Amino acid sequence: NKLYTCKIAEANTIWITQVDPNFYQVNEPSRFYQLLEYGLYFTNQTRMTTQEINPRWGQTFSAGYTHSPLEHIDLGYQWWGDGHLYFPGFTTNHSLSLYGGFQHMSDKERNYSNKILYPRGITLPGYEIASLRTGYHMPIAFPDLPLSSLLYLKTINAAVFYDWGSSRNKFGKATYSSYGIELTTDTHFFRLTYPIRLGIRTGYETQHKKMFADLIFSIGLSI
């Protein structure tokens, strides 16, 4: 790559000349950084039956800290904490779930990767983010139906949710919310023991004041 400099003469004449690289030094920032991350994790829950979507009682908490002591430039630091709480619903196999998360980044210009869950349907850019997610989950049917040797349909579930989020950046603070419904099914493919959850989520979010729809996909890899 060649560097050029622009010179302006008195008579509004402009000309461009090539720069001799021997007299200039160009420093490009590294695209890869070495980070150190520390964390704590705690979980406690009741044993689940095959028909339950979530544990009747459960608590999961995590917290962490990330910084860059090995870099020659100061990338700042990040800390976060979040937790899940599960409670019994109004009837058998129903479940109420609560989630709360908070993260803070010291550098207001450069963001680390996100560590907490956003409100559904919303993206929260900023150096300080808070999130609250609530959901009520219920099974609709238990078909236990093998559709072929490749697919086994286990359960069909539904959920309603309401989420809230707050984001602070260099321009100020903003809060948003979303609400909607989810429809999912728990399946097994190729006779594998690991359950796969497929579904769709639709709702309304106040960030852009419009409806949204997401696909849901998760794999249970518990040992």
Model-inferred region functions:
Residues 37-40, 132-134, 181-183, 211-223:
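Outer-membrane beta-barrel "beta-signal"
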Residues 93, 136, 155-189, 198:
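Outer-membrane beta-barrel transmembrane domain signature
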